[in-house]
Amino acid sequence: MGLSDDEWNHVLGIWAKVEPDLSAHGQEVIIRLFQLHPETQERFAKFKNLTTIDALKSSEEVKKHGTTVLTALGRILKQKNNHEQELKPLAESHATKHKIPVKYLEFICEIIVKVIAEKHPSDFGADSQAAMKKALELFRNDMASKYKEFGFQG
């Protein structure tokens, strides 16, 4: 299920467009996640009181968390599936401390693809979208596998 060199080139090519503005991309991803899947917001004590879109948009903590999420994902993507060193601590914290279900990873990965498509329509064609979806599926599967190693069925 690995990606070809061409697919990785598509993934990293679009990621190079995302990286200069991780905070805006990340903020949009987190806000959309909370809008579409309100149960995910309940996992974050610091975001529970942000009950409106305006409150989410004006929250520096939401922007900061979105940046953190996309920064970590970018480091993993750049490893081109040789991401054990980056993935293991992320999986451990999400499995043992935060208890984030794999389903939530699926939600956020779908939203990441949608946000990139909206922000970069001319650079994120069908081949790039397919490659990114495949890379994110690989990420999710590897996270799920690590979760099991840490005793979390998520």
From Swiss-Prot:
Binding-site positions, heme b: H94
Pfam families: Globin (PF00042)
Gene3D superfamilies: 6.10.140.2100, 6.10.140.2110
Chain positions recorded as nitrite binding sites: H65
GO MF, one annotated term: metal ion binding
Key word Transport present: yes
Annotated catalysed reactions: Fe(III)-heme b-[protein] + nitric oxide + H2O = Fe(II)-heme b-[protein] + nitrite + 2 H(+); H2O2 + AH2 = A + 2 H2O
UniProt superkingdom: Eukaryota
Globin domain span: 2-148
Keyword terms: Cytoplasm, Heme, Iron, Metal-binding, Muscle protein, Oxidoreductase, Oxygen transport, Transport
InterPro entries membership: Globin, Globin-like_sf, Myoglobin
Protein EC: 1.7.-.-, 1.11.1.-
Places the protein is found: Cytoplasm, Sarcoplasm
PROSITE patterns for the chain: GLOBIN
GO annotation, biological process: removal of superoxide radicals
Annotated binding of O2, by residue: H65
Primary location class: cytoplasm
One cellular component (GO) term of this entry: sarcoplasm
Family: Belongs to the globin family.
Physiological role: Monomeric heme protein which primary function is to store oxygen and facilitate its diffusion within muscle tissues. Reversibly binds oxygen through a pentacoordinated heme iron and enables its timely and efficient release as needed during periods of heightened demand. Depending on the oxidative conditions of tissues and cells, and in addition to its ability to bind oxygen, it also has a nitrite reductase activity whereby it regulates the production of bioactive nitric oxide.
Subunit description: Monomeric.
Protein name: Myoglobin
The organism of origin for this protein: Caretta caretta
